[in-house]
């Protein structure tokens, strides 16, 4: 078991670039494989989750050249994938499994998706139900709710689907299946989730349109290979944003970060807490907004977080909880029940770890109440096999009275392989 320790910091200073966006990296491989011609991808995140997607498409006959800096994908068109000779292993990646389930439902072959012990516990029925309405044939354990998933490719028909959850993975699975469906497919959701799929589908030339409350796509249109420059992942930048806010005397510039408005809930929340965060050098790249983020240490205050802010910051809540634990007053988080079905139950995991660090935390069904304190206590924290829990508690250690040790940190490699090295480079102990 790998263990990491974080010690109290004097300051966090410097300029950094975080690895490429995880969501965009997944989608670049998928659409580059389905497009006609060559797609080049710069800034691809070489984390375990994204490599699982890359390996899956190689197993379906896609040729990908990798020189260490740029991927060159030889796309075979919408119907150019080949039947895999073995089970496709998604590792810990829910994005890989859910999006590929939609994409593979419209193929002309049989495939099976599996994952690690954590992914095999995560709910899949939320994806299978709309796909079944489109005519897909997908089987899974627990009545279709758990992987492994067996997919018998078949003809699909367009549907109008009102999703009960605001989930980019559910929405994206339906849209990818919609590329193969007869007619038009529409998806609406309670609150707008991240829209990377819509943007990249449009960038590759899909017949897709977004409107107030939803998205529609018409099947059958071929995609064309493109050049993609993947921006830095705001979910990875979030750890360093919080680090600079909670350690007095800190100032940090994070360069080239994707600031898609469906992902900037973390910035809105931290600014509402009193965080000194400014965007500089705003520009656009490959259909996505990008900026440099300047963060200065700040006295934070507790706030209420809920509603449409939640899906815009869904992956950042573990480190938001760390910020809340060091804010003046109480932070109330609601409407975040989705956190209970991530890589682990993130509400329970963060409550457990912050309580060990001396923080007053009360769990609710769909969130938590966190009462801030001036300094956290040193402790031994558990990652529960979740990369974001592990990294959040290592950030917490920077503002503790004594060191915080985190058990089982191998999981950090799923999204941020150089996290600890980058953190050490900007932290003065």
Curated annotation (Swiss-Prot):
Main location: cytoplasm
Enzyme class: transferase
Residues that bind 3-phosphoshikimate: 22-23, 27, 167, 169, 315, 342
UniProt GO MF annotations: 3-phosphoshikimate 1-carboxyvinyltransferase activity
Enzyme Commission number(s) from the entry: 2.5.1.19
Residues forming the catalytic site: 315 (proton acceptor)
Binding site for phosphoenolpyruvate: 22, 94, 122, 169, 346, 388
Record field: transmembrane: none
Compartment annotation: Cytoplasm
Domain of life, source organism: Bacteria
Any single GO CC term annotated in Swiss-Prot or TrEMBL for this entry: cytoplasm
Keywords: Amino-acid biosynthesis, Aromatic amino acid biosynthesis, Cytoplasm, Transferase
InterPro entries with a match to the protein in the record: Enolpyruvate_Tfrase_dom, Enolpyruvate_Tfrase_sf, EPSP_synthase, EPSP_synthase_CS, RNA3'P_cycl/enolpyr_Trfase_a/b
GO annotation terms (biological process): amino acid biosynthetic process; aromatic amino acid family biosynthetic process; chorismate biosynthetic process
UniProt keyword Amino-acid biosynthesis, yes or no: yes
Reactions the enzyme catalyzes: 3-phosphoshikimate + phosphoenolpyruvate = 5-O-(1-carboxyvinyl)-3-phosphoshikimate + phosphate
Coiled-coil blocks: none
Pathway terms, separated by semicolons: Metabolic intermediate biosynthesis; chorismate biosynthesis; chorismate from D-erythrose 4-phosphate and phosphoenolpyruvate: step 6/7
Matching HAMAP family: EPSP_synth (MF_00210)
PANTHER family per record: AROM/DEHYDROQUINATE SYNTHASE, PENTAFUNCTIONAL AROM POLYPEPTIDE
Subunit structure of this chain's protein: Monomer.
NCBIfam families linked: aroA
Function: Catalyzes the transfer of the enolpyruvyl moiety of phosphoenolpyruvate (PEP) to the 5-hydroxyl of shikimate-3-phosphate (S3P) to produce enolpyruvyl shikimate-3-phosphate and inorganic phosphate.
Stated family: Belongs to the EPSP synthase family.
Name by which UniProt lists this protein: 3-phosphoshikimate 1-carboxyvinyltransferase
Gene field: aroA
């Amino acid at each position: 078991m790998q263990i990491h320790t974080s010690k109290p910091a004097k300051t966090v200073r410097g300029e950094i670039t975080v690895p490429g966006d995880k969501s965009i990296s997944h989608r670049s491989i998928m659409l580059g494989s389905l497009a006609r011609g060559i797609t080049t991808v710069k800034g691809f995140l070489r984390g375990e989750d994204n490599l699982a997607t890359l390996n899956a498409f190689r197993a379906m006959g896609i040729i990908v050249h990798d020189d260490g800096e740029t991927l060159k994908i030889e796309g075979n068109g919408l119907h150019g994938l080949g039947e895999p000779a073995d089970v496709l292993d998604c590792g810990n990646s829910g994005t890989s499994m859910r999006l590929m389930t939609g994409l593979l439902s419209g193929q002309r072959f049989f495939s099976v998706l599996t994952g690690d012990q954590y992914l095999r516990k995560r709910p899949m029925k939320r994806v299978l139900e709309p796909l079944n309405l489109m005519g897909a044939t997908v089987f899974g354990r627990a009545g279709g709710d758990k992987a492994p998933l067996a997919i018998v490719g078949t003809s699909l028909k367009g549907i109008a689907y009102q999703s009960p959850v605001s989930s980019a993975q559910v929405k994206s699975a339906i849209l990818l299946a919609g590329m193969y469906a007869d007619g038009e497919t529409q998806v609406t959701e309670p609150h707008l989730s991240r829209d990377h799929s819509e943007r990249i589908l449009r960038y590759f030339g899909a017949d897709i349109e977004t409107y107030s409350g939803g998205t529609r796509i018409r099947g059958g249109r071929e995609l064309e290979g493109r050049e993609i420059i993947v921006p830095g992942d705001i979910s990875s930048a979030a750890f360093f944003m919080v680090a600079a806010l909670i350690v007095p005397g800190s100032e940090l510039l994070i360069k080239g970060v994707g600031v898609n408005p469906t992902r900037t809930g973390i910035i809105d929340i931290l600014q509402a807490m009193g965080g000194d965060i400014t965007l500089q050098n705003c520009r656009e790249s490959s259909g996505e907004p990008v900026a440099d983020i300047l963060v200065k240490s700040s006295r934070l205050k507790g706030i209420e977080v809920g509603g449409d802010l939640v899906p815009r910051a869904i992956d950042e809540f573990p480190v938001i909880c760390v910020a809340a634990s060091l804010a003046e007053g109480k932070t109330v988080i609601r409407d975040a029940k989705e956190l209970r079905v991530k890589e682990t139950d993130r509400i329970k995991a963060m409550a457990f770890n912050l309580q060990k660090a001396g923080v007053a935390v009360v769990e609710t069904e769909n969130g938590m109440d966190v009462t801030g304190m001036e300094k956290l206590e040193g402790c031994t924290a558990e990652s529960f096999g979740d990369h974001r829990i592990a990294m959040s508690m290592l950030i917490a250690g920077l503002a503790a009275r004594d060191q915080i040790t985190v058990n089982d940190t191998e999981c950090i490699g799923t999204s941020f392989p150089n996290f600890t090295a980058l953190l050490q480079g900007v932290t003065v102990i």
